[in-house]
Amino acid sequence: MLPSQSPAIFTVSRLNQTVRLLLEHEMGQVWISGEISNFTQPASGHWYFTLKDDTAQVRCAMFRNSNRRVTFRPQHGQQVLVRANITLYEPRGDYQIIVESMQPAGEGLLQQKYEQLKAKLQAEGLFDQQYKKPLPSPAHCVGVITSKTGAALHDILHVLKRRDPSLPVIIYPAAVQGDDAPGQIVRAIELANQRNECDVLIVGRGGGSLEDLWSFNDERVARAIFTSRIPVVSAVGHETDVTIADFVADLRAPTPSAAAEVVSRNQQELLRQVQSTRQRLEMAMDYYLANRTRRFTQIHHRLQQQHPQLRLARQQTMLERLQKRMSFALENQLKRTGQQQQRLTQRLNQQNPQPKIHRAQTRIQQLEYRLAETLRAQLSATRERFGNAVTHLEAVSPLSTLARGYSVTTATDGNVLKKVKQVKAGEMLTTRLEDGWIESEVKNIQPVKKSRKKVH
């Protein structure tokens, strides 16, 4: 007998697929440490190897686009730390991991801690741009937190002396390597904020390995930099070295020397700017004085030109010239007016309307006479044509034919009878005479035989 509720039955394919999905979704990405064995690299460029410890092993694959980023050549027996995704190869049911990154075991553990702390602080918003404080421009006092015996301090002081010797520098010595270094760096940052002597801080050290720089990946140092009221410039290691302190700081400088250049002014450049500004001011003053002198000369000349005696003489000369022009213009105007009057008189005499009126009256009389004669002739001809037309119409009128004794007979359908075959006995006929109509009934029909014409 079967139970009331049967357990789910998987096919092998479905089982492998279900296990693969569980591994990928539930486990996600993990960090694994172990020893490399059976390392191979076929022509495809992918890496295939086994990762093992004392009691277990797992098959691994690292595809070409991922292993390109590995900075060393994996060796048999090497201890490594890998970041990988767990999966299942369904056709064979083999459990394996797909490696995304690989590091030697020592640095790998530190890198894992680095990534975890970075993700944590980033999630809290310590890296957000909105919290970055602007650097003072220019800085009036610079604080340096680093080792008092390190090369970084020497580089910073050398750059500041070269660029801006007058800029005050306060050194807050702290260890930058070792177990006590994070605590000393935090206390130096807090001390600088308590004393409030400087308006920008440089926190850093020279280059080194990941372990050497690890103090600047400490969470306490990161939070001290974030809470500092004084803007902080991080200057840790070389340009390729990136620490947690770099993400939290208000500005990251690739090297300690670069940090010193960022917070200082170039004295030589400032001197060149002052000299350039002085030259521009001198040129501006020269131009201003020349412009004022030219303006003064123009005004002085205008005042001389506007002297009352000179103005009176010029106006008197202008008045005499205007009087001459007025007299000449008046004479010309009178002369032109007289000539125009003569021309108008001649034109008026030539355009006397009386002769034209007489000729027009004569022409009108002639046209009236010709019009009357033409109308009489046309009327007489029209009357004659009308009389002829009336006579012709009376001659061809049906009424005239009826008056001569003829008649017109129509059948009941209104058609005029021309032949006897159009009617039948008993039908009613209507006959039109000159003075009225007659209705009659057909009693008998007698066709008339046509006479044959003799042919000669």
Swiss-Prot record:
UniProt keyword annotations, A-Z: Cytoplasm, DNA-binding, Exonuclease, Hydrolase, Nuclease
Gene Ontology MF: a single term: exodeoxyribonuclease VII activity
Subcellular location per the Swiss-Prot or TrEMBL entry: Cytoplasm
Mutant phenotype after disruption: No longer processes msDNA correctly (when retron Ec78 or Ec83 are expressed in the strain).
GO BP: DNA catabolic process; mismatch repair
Cofactor binding, note field: Does not require a metal cofactor.
Region (Binds ssDNA, also required to bind the small subunit): 1-103
Catalytic activity line of the entry: Exonucleolytic cleavage in either 5'- to 3'- or 3'- to 5'-direction to yield nucleoside 5'-phosphates
Pfam families assigned: Exonuc_VII_L, tRNA_anti_2
InterPro entries per UniProt: Exonuc_VII_L (IPR003753), Exonuc_VII_lsu_C (IPR020579), OB-fold_nuc-bd_dom (IPR025824)
Domain of life assignment: Bacteria
Biophysicochemical property: pH dependence: Optimum pH is 7.8 to 7.9.
Enzyme Commission code(s) on record: 3.1.11.6
Swiss-Prot/TrEMBL domain comment: Predicted to have 4 domains. The N-terminus (about residues 1-103) binds ssDNA and is required to bind the small subunit; it probably has an OB-fold. The predicted catalytic domain is residues 104-266. Three alpha-helices are predicted in the C-terminal region (residues 267-301, 307-349 and 353-393), their removal singly or in pairs reduces small subunit-binding; none of the deletions have exonuclease activity. The extreme C-terminus (394-456) is required for exonuclease activity. The N-terminus (residues 1-257) at low levels does not confer processing of msDNA and at higher levels is lethal.
General function of this protein: Bidirectionally degrades single-stranded DNA into large acid-insoluble oligonucleotides, which are then degraded further into small acid-soluble oligonucleotides. It can degrade 3' or 5' ss regions extending from the termini of duplex DNA molecules and displaced ss regions. It can also excise thymine dimers in vitro. ssDNA-binding requires both subunits. Required for production of the mature 5'-end of retron Ec78 or Ec83 msDNA.
HAMAP family: Exonuc_7_L (MF_00378)
Family annotation (PANTHER family): EXODEOXYRIBONUCLEASE 7 LARGE SUBUNIT (PTHR30008:SF0)
Name by which UniProt lists this protein: Exodeoxyribonuclease 7 large subunit
Lineage: Bacteria, Pseudomonadati, Pseudomonadota, Gammaproteobacteria, Enterobacterales
Underlying gene: xseA
